[in-house]
């Protein structure tokens, strides 16, 4: 009998549009001969399943099921592709743990750590991972322009500490830009991270592990036409994404080894993607860890899967079957 798979998308942040795109990508990637697929949209208290006829029906949160006519359908597995809360920060994972439904990605702790950029960086720094200098501001806290310049320097990045897709991010070059950038970041999240700029080559590396194997994908080099890898660059084509990256085999191996180590340190599950900046002297610096990476047809992970000579359908099957 086919397993019923929920592709869980939506969320309560600006990234909802990106999440819904990823859901369509995942729907196209998963083997429909093996699984019954349904997209489940979550937004606030609205949890709905998309039916084949285009209509939507509510999800019963008691057991994560829905009624399809007179038939009750209970999901066997959740593929979480919510970028942002509640799917990337551990909240939804806690719900699925409580009702004992397996899911595609990291558990509560790893998701919560990686969703908080500042906490994740400080945690991994303790294991010897290189990170940039940064400051954290919480709602109600303030920092002077002088302190930013003295402690972090210019240029710097001011961004929401929670969230992704570069919403609310500003590359700050002058003192006059600091406070407006902080206000912009606070409009997206309750915490703001002020991070030192690092110039160099931007790379990203995907990885997943199962009970039987460990797979680290070829690296992608990210060359943006904009000031930085912002929303336009990510989703409107203002970037060159080169897979495999134009770097030495030795540096490739080092980045892949570090990615695998970060996966294990954090206790990850499913597919993750780790972003880096390579600075002078081939120093590998962590940017961030993504535990629910984008999965549209043109996203980094599908590109890397193709470059590795793998079939994305087989990768999706690995992720699902590893939980049974």
From Swiss-Prot:
ATP binds at residues 149-204. Belongs to the D-alanine--D-alanine ligase family. This is D-alanine--D-alanine ligase. Its EC number is 6.3.2.4. Pathway: Cell wall biogenesis; peptidoglycan biosynthesis. Mg(2+) 2 binds at residues 288, 290. It is an enzyme of class 6 (ligase). Disulfide bonds: none annotated. GO terms for cellular component: cytoplasm. PANTHER family: D-ALANINE--D-ALANINE LIGASE, D-ALANINE--D-ALANINE LIGASE B. Mg(2+) 1 binds at residues 275, 288. Binds 2 magnesium or manganese ions per subunit. GO terms for biological process: cell wall organization; peptidoglycan biosynthetic process; regulation of cell shape. One of its GO terms (molecular function) is D-alanine-D-alanine ligase activity. The lineage of its organism: Bacteria, Pseudomonadati, Bacteroidota, Bacteroidia, Bacteroidales. It comes from the Bacteria. Keywords: ATP-binding, Cell shape, Cell wall biogenesis/degradation, Cytoplasm, Ligase, Magnesium, Manganese, Metal-binding, Nucleotide-binding, Peptidoglycan synthesis. InterPro entries: ATP-grasp (IPR011761), ATP_grasp_subdomain_1 (IPR013815), D-Ala_lig_Van_CS (IPR000291), D_ala_D_ala (IPR005905), Dala_Dala_lig_C (IPR011095), Dala_Dala_lig_N (IPR011127), PreATP-grasp_dom_sf (IPR016185). Residues 121-321 form the ATP-grasp domain.
């Amino acid at each position: 009998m086919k397993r019923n798979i929920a592709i869980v998308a939506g969320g309560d942040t600006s990234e909802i549009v990106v999440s819904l795109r990823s859901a369509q990508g995942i729907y196209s990637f998963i083997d429909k001969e093996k699984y019954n697929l349904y997209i489940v949209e979550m937004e606030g208290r609205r949890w709905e399943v998309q039916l084949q006829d285009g209509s939507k029906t509510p999800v019963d949160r008691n057991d994560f099921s829905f009624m399809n006519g007179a038939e009750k359908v209970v999901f066997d597995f959740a593929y979480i592709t919510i970028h942002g809360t509640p799917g990337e920060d551990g909240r939804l994972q806690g719900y699925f743990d409580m009702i004992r439904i397996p899911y595609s990605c990291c558990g509560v702790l790893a998701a919560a750590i990686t969703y908080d950029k500042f906490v994740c960086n400080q945690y991994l720094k303790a294991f010897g991972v290189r990170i940039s200098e940064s400051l954290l501001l919480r709602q109600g806290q303030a920092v002077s322009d002088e302190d930013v310049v003295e402690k972090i320097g210019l240029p710097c990045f001011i961004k929401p500490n929670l969230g992704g897709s570069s919403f609310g991010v500003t590359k700050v070059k002058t003192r006059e830009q600091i406070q407006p950038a902080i206000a912009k970041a606070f409009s997206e999240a309750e915490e703001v991270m002020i991070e030192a700029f690092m110039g160099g080559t931007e790379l990203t590396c995907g990885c997943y592990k199962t009970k039987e194997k460990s797979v680290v994908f070829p690296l992608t080099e990210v060359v943006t036409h904009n000031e930085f890898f912002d929303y336009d660059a990510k989703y409107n084509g203002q970037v060159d994404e080169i897979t495999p990256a134009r770097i030495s085999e030795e540096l490739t191996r080092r980045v892949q080894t570090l990615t695998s180590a970060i996966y294990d340190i954090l206790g990850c599950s499913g597919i993750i993607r780790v972003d880096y900046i390579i600075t002078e002297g081939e120093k590998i610096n962590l940017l961030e860890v993504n535990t629910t990476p984008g999965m549209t047809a043109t996203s980094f992970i599908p590109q890397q899967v193709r470059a590795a000579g793998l079939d994305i359908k087989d990768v999706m099957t690995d992720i699902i079957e590893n939980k049974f």
